Regions:
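Non-heme di-metal
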Residues: 1-360
Length: 360
């Protein structure tokens, strides 16, 4: 274990694993991580990455005097459908929605591989102050690569993409998976990029900061989704493999912690510094991070409050093979979790007469 006073690490160190005694084998595929001598799961690529992030965070707080950036907890709306609603559907013989939701999580996790392709301009070209010995300085020296491998796997080693598929197949006894699930996700992701908020910084710089802020928001919002999945898949009344399926989700949740922390750290380091426009003028890093993160949060809340409930009900209506789907939906709705967004996001609340239940 490296001394926490260290601030500079090689790519190989950031990607290094802690020793394990037993591999994690999922559906015949060796996945990342493993089990130590006491049988405890150990997340991959954490031998140096975790203490490095801790050291960078401590340095940031000591030198800037400011707290780490975070996504406000009050913006994370309850999961929809909630645990009770999903269990009701499964006990009613309506399995296809859960098959689809778990498949969507797996597919989106696999998209995490794309983070390694994110262009990072030379830091000195847009940050006035020194960035040596920071998380920022290690984005292309292991942090993005570790994140990509965690989510999508690496060479023959499975990652979260494969682990979510396995959890779904174990809990729901190898359901048929429609290829339409993937194509629908691709279609939704095909929307163009938002208009720039800070064109004076140049597109590559804004894209980098926007991407990190959006991924952090996704990771924070997803934490409640993963807890939701673990609670459902661990219930023997609705899960065909409650121990195996829930354990896989538990391992994934442990793996996600370094993603949240390194992104918080890098964004905090930007906040504490002065950014430079294309013509060399200073811009507050705090304002850039806050404004880009705020837009991302608003987009996610709009989707969860307005778009997701409609998609959920449409999916149930299309796939529920029951005599009276309207009666099913009435019972489903009665189990929902009402939620009112914080006052600063009141304009995003569903319109009068729309579903009051929030979504993923």
């Amino acid at each position: 274990m490296p001394h926490e006073s260290r601030l500079n690490f090689s790519t190989d160190e950031i990607l290094a694993n802690v020793p394990t005694r037993e591999a994690l084998i999922v559906k015949g595929v060796k996945c990342h991580g493993g089990f130590d001598a006491d049988g405890n799961y150990r997340s991959p690529r954490t031998a140096f990455r975790v203490p490095a992030i801790k050291a960078w965070q401590e340095q940031h707080i000591a030198t800037s005097g400011t707290a780490l950036f975070e996504i406000p907890a009050d913006t994370v709306s309850p999961q929809v459908p909630n645990v009770a609603q999903v269990k009701f559907l499964l006990k009613s013989g309506v399995r296809e929605p859960m098959v689809r939701w778990l498949s969507e999580i797996a597919i989106v996790e696999g998209f995490g591989a794309m983070i390694r392709e994110l262009p990072v301009p030379p830091l000195s070209s847009f940050i006035r102050e020194d960035t040596a010995g920071t998380a920022l300085a290690h984005l292309t020296s292991g942090l993005f690569e570790a994140h990509a491998r965690d989510e999508a796997g690496w060479t023959e080693e499975g990652g979260h993409r494969q682990m979510w598929d396995a959890a779904r197949d174990a809990a729901l006894s190898n359901p048929a998976i429609s290829p339409e699930i993937y194509t629908a996700i691709i279609a939704r992701r095909g929307a163009g990029q938002p208009a720039p908020l800070f064109p004076e910084l140049g597109e590559p710089v804004e894209r980098l900061i926007r991407f990190m802020a959006n991924v952090l928001a996704i990771e924070v919002f997803a934490a409640s989704t993963f807890a939701w999945a673990e609670e459902i898949l661990s219930d023997p009344e609705v899960s065909d493999a409650p121990d195996d399926a829930a354990n896989l989700v538990r391992f994934i949740r442990a793996d996600e912690a370094p993603h949240v922390q390194y992104l918080r750290t890098a964004l905090s380091e930007i906040q504490a510094r002065t950014l430079l426009t294309l013509d060399g003028k200073p811009v507050s890093g705090r304002k850039v991070v806050n404004d880009l993160a705020e837009r991302g949060i608003r987009t996610m809340l709009r989707q969860r409050l307005n778009e997701r409930p409609v998609m959920v009900r449409d999916l149930i209506r299309k796939t529920a093979n029951v005599k009276d789907v309207d009666a099913l939906l009435r019972e489903f709705d009665a189990l929902g979790t009402p939620w009112t967004p914080p006052a600063r996001y009141a304009d995003l609340a569903p319109e009068a007469g729309a579903s009051a239940h929030v979504g993923y």
